[in-house]
C-alpha cells in the first residue's frame, strides 16, 4: 500500500518518494 502525498493527496510511489517529518511527499511537491 502506497502512502498519500502530504501536499497534493495523491498516491506517492517508491520511485518518487521523499520522506520528511514522518510524512511522504512527491519530489515535486516537497
UniProtKB/Swiss-Prot annotation:
Transmembrane segments: none
Domain LIM zinc-binding residue range list: 5-30
GO CC annotation terms, alphabetical: cortical actin cytoskeleton
Record's subunit section: Interacts with F-actin. Interacts with ANKRD54. Interacts with KBTBD10.
Main localization, broad class: cytoplasm
Description of post-translational modifications: Phosphorylated.
Functional summary from the UniProt entry: Plays an important role in the regulation of dynamic actin-based, cytoskeletal activities. Agonist-dependent changes in LASP1 phosphorylation may also serve to regulate actin-associated ion transport activities, not only in the parietal cell but also in certain other F-actin-rich secretory epithelial cell types.
Positions of disulphide bridges: none
Residues modified to N-acetylmethionine: 1
Name of this protein: LIM and SH3 domain protein 1
Record localization: Cytoplasm, Cell cortex; Cytoplasm, Cytoskeleton
Domain of life where this protein originates: Eukaryota
